[in-house]
From Swiss-Prot:
Substrate binds at N261, G318, I319, V320. This is Succinate--CoA ligase [ADP-forming] subunit beta. Pfam families: ATP-grasp_2, Ligase_CoA. It is an enzyme of class 6 (ligase). The keyword Ribonucleoprotein does not apply. It comes from Campylobacter hominis (strain ATCC BAA-381 / DSM 21671 / CCUG 45161 / LMG 19568 / NCTC 13146 / CH001A). It catalyses: succinate + ATP + CoA = succinyl-CoA + ADP + phosphate; GTP + succinate + CoA = succinyl-CoA + GDP + phosphate. Its cofactor is Mg(2+). One of its GO terms (biological process) is tricarboxylic acid cycle. GO terms for cellular component: cytosol; succinate-CoA ligase complex.
Length: 387
């Protein structure tokens, strides 16, 4: 789960991380009132969406008077903001964050995330802040792995601080800043805390000028305050609905719908589709306890995507029985008008019974495949009108 910048900064404050004063606004008039209350003579007007690159997309403006605050608020609210992270469709801006300006001497990048290969917490830092870390020369990036059994220590901060060119006094301040970030990361079960930029002010203090946070969904039951920050407007409606039925669904931009059991098999299926010249329209894992009803719901969700031209169902029956999947497919054809071709590959528990069920139904646009590659090739051919 991701949260907005203003929410991430609320959490930063709780852990003693310096952030500028700011508040949320839902209208241009409210933005002006917020700026008045904050005081000062420079304010940042920031679009609040779950994506980076807002500045380049026109979603962050610096206002030097209240008239400009109102003008920029009117420009940003209601706009569809397109960035590298939103995709071409962009995201609708429903709220903005008004923040006091600060005296910036230098910008940096710093983040904490989980290094799965090392099973440690990855600290990434760069003196090139304010831009996407993927665009920075690798020689300007410092990476460090922190053993969670040991935690962040002063020597970690000093090693990174030396790389960033800090003197002793700044290293001590950087350690305090970084220690707050680390405690925030651990305490909230975050999978990402990204400060871009972290700025050094004219007063030689470190501030989080922007903050991005993501969390492990499986740990949200331990954090009711964070779960309450979820903004469903920022999430794909089909993905939200799928979760309610125990389905793991992620919408993509291809034209071959996928329905698979197990995340590993799902990723392997998508790779095979790509290898065969196709492009997946989604990731969909029906899980191990799929019933005929959940399979029918999965079909309904896939078919809602008008880009989908064929569907590939790839099931290996272990816990989930293949005959349940077959019944779900047949149920889906009764409840929803399935006009596109459906390729079905079933193997494992009750696979023979399942295949017989589909044969007996004799539905014209359901095709059977014996293995993964055959199924993927057929799904790609059917998209192109071949058989």
């Amino acid at each position: 789960m991701n949260i907005h910048e203003y929410q991430a900064k609320e959490l930063c404050r709780e852990f003693g991380i310096n952030v500028s004063n700011g508040a949320l606004a839902l209208s241009a008039d409210e933005a002006v009132e917020v700026a008045k209350k904050l005081g000062g003579n420079v304010w940042a007007v920031k679009a609040q969406i779950h994506a980076g690159g807002r500045g380049l997309g026109g979603g962050v403006k610096i206002a030097k008077n209240l008239d400009e605050v109102k003008k920029y608020a009117n420009q940003i609210l209601g706009m569809t903001l397109v960035t590298k992270q939103t995709g071409p469709k962009g995201k609708l801006v429903r709220k903005i964050y008004i923040e006091q300006g600060c005296n910036i001497k230098k910008e940096f990048y710093v983040s904490l995330t989980f290094n799965r290969a090392k099973e440690q917490i990855g600290l990434i830092a760069s003196a090139s802040g304010g831009m996407g870390i993927e665009e920075v020369d690798k020689n300007l990036i410092k990476t460090l792995n922190i053993d969670p059994q040991i935690g962040l220590k002063a020597f970690h901060a000093y090693e990174v601080g030396d790389f960033l060119g800090f003197d002793k006094d700044l290293n001590n301040k950087f350690y305090k800043f970084l220690n707050g970030l680390y405690k925030l990361y651990i305490a909230t079960d975050a999978n990402l805390v990204e400060i871009n930029p972290m700025v050094l002010t004219a007063e030689d203090e470190f501030f989080a000028l922007d903050a991005k946070m993501g969390f492990d969904d499986a740990a949200l039951f331990r954090h009711e305050n964070i779960a309450a920050m979820r903004d469903l407007d920022e999430e794909e409606s089909s993905e939200v609905e799928a979760k309610q039925y125990g389905l793991s669904y992620v919408k993509l931009d291809g034209d071959i719908g996928c329905m698979v059991n197990g995340a590993g098999l799902a990723m392997g299926t998508m790779d095979t589709i790509t290898y065969c010249g196709g492009k997946s329209a989604n990731f969909l894992d029906v899980g191990g306890g799929a019933s005929a009803e959940t399979v029918a719901k999965a079909f309904e969700i896939i078919l809602r995507d008008k880009n989908v031209k064929s569907i590939f169902v790839n099931i290996f029956g272990g816990i989930v029985r293949c005959d349940r999947i077959a019944k779900g497919i047949l149920e889906a054809t009764k409840l929803t008008k399935v006009e596109i071709p459906v390729v079905v590959r079933l193997d494992g528990t009750n696979a023979k019974e399942a295949i017989e069920l589909l044969k007996e139904a004799n539905i014209e646009n359901i095709y059977s495949a014996h293995d993964l590659e055959e199924g993927a090739k057929l799904a790609v051919k059917l998209v192109n009108g071949e058989k």
